[in-house]
């Protein structure tokens, strides 16, 4: 059973996340030749204050 973990910065809507889960499930099932019902997708939303880019938090970069 494939387990896919995705980490994204928080702020996307439920529909966007549902579409992401659906599209990733379809791609994994097709490419690994497994039933879509066996694919697990975990989406972790990370606060921008906890997401670092170039030594600074994404939140601080957005304020600049």
Where are these regions (language model features)?
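A domain-level signal for the structural core that forms small-molecule/cofactor-binding pockets
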Residues: 2-64
